[in-house]
Amino acid sequence: MPLTLSTRNPGFEAAFRALLAAKRESAAEVEDAVAAIIDGVAARGDAALVEYTNRFDRVRLSPDRLRLSPEEIAAGADRAAPETVAALRLAAERIESFHRRQLPSGIDYVDPLGVRLGQRWRPIEAVGLYVPGGTASYPSSVLMNAIPAKVAGVERLVMTVPAPDGILNPLVLAAAQMVGIAEIYRIGGAQAVAALAYGTATIAPVDKIVGPGNAYVAAAKRRVFGRVGIDMIAGPSEILVLADRHNDPGWIAADLLSQAEHDRAAQAILISDDADFADAVESAVARHLELLPRAEIARASWQENGAIILVADWDEAVALIDRVAPEHLELAIEEADSVALRVRHAGAIFLGRHTPEAIGDYIAGPNHVLPTARSARFASGLGVLDFMKRTTIVGCDAASLAALAPAAILLAEAEGLDAHALSLALRLGHE
């Protein structure tokens, strides 16, 4: 059974803190295994990559078979159902339209002292996109990760996708083909992350790695960060639904399960001001679980990590939401707009009863790669700026340098950095 809490109960605060502190991340043995895999790929390159791929994905490969040929990509994409490809194309159009609005503008101006100041944006040169291939395969993630990179102007976009038992999802290949990814490798897990970060004889290294994955992939991204950039450390999926009694309990139950079905470690939380409605949602969850193909995963997630929280009013709810800082926040209430304005910490907010989180996962337009594990307190969802770098520009002539340098010399001397001061003083004609 999910945890049930009420703000009216004396023990609420302690129980809520325990809910926030519950660990759903990877264990030490995962970190140790990932370290060994990364060290192996860094040291032995293709040989280690092939060895791990053969072991974990149960497929016999050689270095010359790691990369998919253009013919393999096209043939795989052709096997995708046409109506689903059409849906992917609609999603791609909407995702691109939204993300084009994120493109930043540069700055270039001359200040009153005559100093030219500015900043410019340039795309990252090479990005690796990790696409999962485990308990579920996600062509939508290809679009959500690749399209912002393409909009940003990334020149080289590399995709890795595991092929368990030699099988690749046709829709994943169709999505890759749709966004123009031509460099695809049939590898996954920590070994794929290592190959993208360190490079091998077959795979040139990239500058940044993005994309979701399991605990091993998350641990690998954490370990290679610094050598390459990463988008974020994605933990298990989360949803928090704020709902009143005017909702259909079956709708809200399905919304909760939409994240619970991702992973046993996923978390679904319902906050409501009506105990009878909350009970009805819990009953609806049980009914849905009798029918869902991924019921075993969803049931484990709901029973082990789910929670129902009863509040007196939306003031209490907003305070709790900000403490949870959920990845996905549904506001299935009449006052959705006004409550949304008061929420400070959420990866994405879905407004009203007719905006289920699932519409954002696929086709609304904003990115579905969002901060988890309470990191929405300081992080944002994936976007165009994640694939760009900002460089600042400073230009002085003799007059503007003469106006600014004396103050800079004083600061350099105060910090004991005499060469700094000297480089300025010499330009002023001081010995």
Predicted segment positions?
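N-terminal Rossmann-like NAD(P)+-binding subdomain of aldehyde/semialdehyde dehydrogenases
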Residues: M1-E125
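Short acidic-hydrophobic, aromatic-tinged amphipathic segments that line or gate anion-handling sites
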Residues: L3-P10, E183-G188, I308-D313
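Conserved small-residue-rich beta-alpha loop and adjacent elements
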Residues: Y109-A174
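Alpha-helix C-terminal capping segments
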Residues: M144-E155, Q177-V179, A197-I203, K221-R223, ...
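Conserved NAD(P)+-binding/catalytic subdomain of aldehyde/semialdehyde dehydrogenases
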Residues: G180-Q267
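A conserved active-site cap/scaffold subdomain adjacent to cofactor or substrate pockets
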Residues: M232-E304, I308
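C-terminal core of ALDH-fold dehydrogenases
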Residues: W314, D322-E431
